[in-house]
């Protein structure tokens, strides 16, 4: 493997504002009827699992900001010219080849599950290291839970795109994927569930009489029906309950009942500017207001209103809706994930967010990454936020919810007050950082408590002790991730892309590809980074399309005071270096995309 530099260079005529390196698509297939599925080289269409999925083709417009309500974000339409055939739509002949299993838990022997009650973390670790039940994560890519196979035996990722070109032993991607367009993340997961290759792969890996466990970010009632018909256990709360809890109005009401207050607000309906003023004055919210509608991406359904002109600009989206009217505060958003179990709510590490950076996303206010470091929350603020999340978890239990959820916490930078922001009742894009912390290695990754809640085993864990330990250990670790989107107004078929794997800075400061890697867990210092490619050669890129995710130790932002941050010099260098590896051929005039592949649910 050569340390090929990944420095920025002059774009070729075939590219628009970006230049590329090289990457070779591979093909992969599986034998459906054999006891062990063998991996083969796969087509070069890759993607990310997260916030929403895309269709393969000529885009139609939107952005993938962090969402908190409706999840069927848009997708692109065909970018092929009339009569042009997608070269990836043809069925490929499988070429079997052996791969070595390189994930930790895979080496553990089976031996059946203990049926006695699990009483401590050591027993939980043993339970998962000897697990005989297939546990499957479905998605466009394995981004959200990548690396979890290190702890869980028989854990597999079923994905539409394969960023490793067949080299990851725990990623299965169907070989035959005729060209089609997906409208949402739910559609791509439902397609995977019903795919013949996928079903054969799962059947071959499932012992007789055992029901596979299935998890995913995006699902709906159709997903539930498919899983029931196939004999799979969907280890997630009901889709109808999740939809109910997605409402910002419901989140506010539940938080108030639980003693987890939001920023001073009033829930109401208004028909005109005078009505909004009257409501705000009565509630003592001041003249600068923030108005939110119940469902949708935060960046698209949050409106800042301080004048009649602002009202006229946004009134069409507000009138007729039940809305949340808040006092506008100077705040710092903080993300945290938690798991609601029968023993109580376990709270993960707190993370800051990367929001709206033009180098990463064309969407103003769009989520584009996270940082975890000791100073995200300290002292009393951390304790207050932890209690806020635990109270909300207890209230969610009364609604029948159990398992994983993410919460946005708002810290008032003027008063240091901590408020409940939004609830995201599902796996989120922050999970990738949560599962790699020092706390995760001291105990188990947070998501394992979610799986445990849905397994056929009894357990009695000291949640208070776990939370105290995680608060101490997680706050001492430093990790960051950036989600990189196409920011130029182009539509191209990619001819070269950076490889998935581990990168590092060479002696001259250039970013070079060091070696293939299955995940980012082996990173040691700030000179190293892991890049997860989403789109590969033969795929398309357009303005707003997710290109990949970069994970590294250390911070990627610098604080400028009063809760404001900017991208660090190191972050900008990493972004420019990775972007320089992309090259493509223009295929159409730029068109606004209708959806995108996101990597954070929300």
Regions found by a protein language model. Give the residues of each.
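Glycine-rich phosphate-binding loop of ATP-grasp-fold ATP-dependent ligases
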Residues: 264-265, 288-312, 333-335, 358-377
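ATP-dependent carboxylate/phosphate-activation module, predominantly the ATP-grasp catalytic core
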Residues: 327-334, 338-391, 424-451
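A long amphipathic alpha-helix within ATP-dependent nucleotide-binding catalytic cores
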Residues: 366-414, 449-478, 483, 569-582
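Intrinsically disordered, polybasic Lys/Arg-rich low-complexity tracts
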Residues: 3-92, 96-98
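A conserved helix-loop-beta module that forms one wall/lid of the active-site cleft
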Residues: 228-301, 587-588
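Peripheral (often C-terminal) accessory segments that flank ATP-dependent C-N-forming ligase machineries
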Residues: 452-602
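Conserved ATP-binding module of the ATP-grasp superfamily
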Residues: 261-263, 284-290, 304-335, 391-398
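ATP-binding N-terminal substructure of ATP-dependent carboxylate-amine bond-forming enzymes
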Residues: 76, 80-244, 273-275, 562-601
